[in-house]
Amino acid sequence: MSHLITLATCNLNQWALDFEGNRDRILQSIKIAKERGARLRVGPELEITGYGCLDHFLENDVCLHSWEMYAQIIKNKETHGLILDIGMPVLHKNVRYNCRLLSLDGEILFIRPKIWLANDGNYREMRFFTPWMKPGVVEDFILPPEIQKVTGQRLVPFGDAVINSLDTCIGTETCEELFTPQSPHIAMSLDGVEIMTNSSGSHHELRKLNKRLDLILNATKRCGGVYLYANQRGCDGDRLYYDGCALIAINGTIVAQGSQFSLDDVEVVTATVDLEEVRSYRAAVMSRGLQASLAEIKFKRIDIPVELALMTSRFDPTVCPTKVREPFYHSPEEEIALGPACWMWDYLRRCNGTGFFLPLSGGIDSCATAMIVHSMCRLVTDAAQNGNEQVIKDVRKITRSGDDWIPDSPQDLASKIFHSCFMGTENSSKETRNRAKDLSNAIGSYHVDLKMDSLVSSVVSLFEVATGKKPIYKIFGGSQIENLALQNIQARLRMVLSYLFAQLLPWVRGIPNSGGLLVLGSANVDECLRGYLTKYDCSSADINPIGGISKTDLKRFIAYASKQYNMPILNDFLNATPTAELEPMTKDYVQSDEIDMGMTYEELGVFGYLRKVEKCGPYSMFLKLLHQWSPKLTPRQISEKVKRFFFFYAINRHKQTVLTPSYHAEQYSPEDNRFDLRPFLINPRFPWASRKIDEVVEQCEAHKGSTLDIMSID
């Protein structure tokens, strides 16, 4: 006998502190869920406020406005007829909790505070909230007076409880709790909970979705049950892009999966599931039954006199469970094309900007940034042509276009909002200038090509007049410090010109009511980690879409875009040697990034991963690389590379304190805002670690020709 229930979860593009906008998106998701016959609707974590409010959560106004929005939602008759699972902060006994509020027909059933808070990486939940440290305990919560008038209730249960309907049992866990070893869904499943909801504020990282889906599928495969995952999506005001992918799973299989990247502000995912499949699946495993009979945690049941199953007195062949489907994953190249593009669109439309300005150097990094803007233009154009009303409204506002205008191609949109500029000097090659121009023509940007030698000469002349000294390049006999100073003059003047052109180009083009353009940066994560950039040069911008992406991944993305977007010009960027073009070129010398850095981009990726993800200091990194790089490199060569990396990392650490806000994409990002917190005054020699490394090198060289047990080295 079937026991069919239709359930709904969603991706919502919420914005921190946009209370009314967030409310409207919640209402729209409820309306869609109800139209599809869902009896339970689950939304993202902290959906009323937006997840990324940060220290604004410490303001009691945020709790006040959350209750005001919540009251408007549940008193709306159109939200009645299904159970609502909505997230917001709640103050209970003068303690602030990250909560889920479950309601039905305008009545609050109970409030469930988050038990295990996310407090690593980009997450700092324990700065704002307190975890609920009373498993299985439920207390009375006194509703605010204004809410009492709406619901007719004075007290509601607050704590670790579950809902008992007439035909099933529903439990909830929140985001991080899925990732913990002792997840709440385990104890709940053993206590008979059949439907588990998870409301999340999970951000995008390259290749991270696999981990999230594996956890959900393994949870329902081991415990049985239905799992509804909801997530925020979009840029809600910070470096993070929440990547949606709402889904519904049952017994280790997926029956519905939402999109990971999209310009849709509201996406509702529904499925019809058969609870008899859950009961049969669980009852067939005897060891699971034994554990359930011995389970010590018994959850408080909140009884509701409602049956959630589809109301039908006899078999209906037109109603059937949703079919199982395979999980969908984007390739890393697709993730780079889509994630930063959606993030940039949210940023642009929400800051009331006119468009973007990009210093287009002819190198692969600025090329990658330009291609992400092109990808954004493709997404916006497709959405507008497919009738996405919010996108149409936003694109007309940004372009200052009439009520009947819709872009007819990505290039049409780019010509209105994307501005690029090649800022050449006598050190620039004809090849890079032509590549920049050809790429601009291919993507449709408004392009400026200028020479800035007179500006550079003016600054050098000013210095010469003031000091009586004139710096010259190294290849002409100058010192290293003169050489760097002359390079930095060019780099920093490009930043000044970028902001000048970003402010005035809309005026030059006669764009009405323009507030200027957003300046885009193009420093990749490896260069940021190594400090291979000039402080306050073109790496200093308003936002940087590639600042969390490695050079290796960017090259793969450009190769992908060349084929996907049919742009053969991109192959010229792939085949070019990465160079800053800040020094004069001769027939015997052309500046090269990797030669300047003393290490390859591939090596930088390894160093970055070991430093951040594996938590290695110089000594531990050296020992790990002895295993990875021997015998291709000698122990002494490995030690020199490790020492060189940490030396330049340390002396350039101060640069990371002022990095342009970048799209978070890589787990070894050196972003200093809150992801990778380190002092910025460090002894670059790491003397004690260096001595220990030298001791190991000497041991290895002494044992040359014989086997050395590296694991025995202390």
Curated annotation (Swiss-Prot):
Residues 329-714 are annotated as: Ligase. It catalyses: deamido-NAD(+) + L-glutamine + ATP + H2O = L-glutamate + AMP + diphosphate + NAD(+) + H(+). The active site is at 45 (proton acceptor), 114 (for glutaminase activity), 175 (nucleophile), 361. Pfam families: CN_hydrolase (PF00795), NAD_synthase (PF02540). One of its GO terms (biological process) is NAD biosynthetic process. One of its GO terms (cellular component) is cytoplasm. Keywords: ATP-binding, Ligase, NAD, Nucleotide-binding. NCBIfam families: nadE (TIGR00552). This is Glutamine-dependent NAD(+) synthetase.
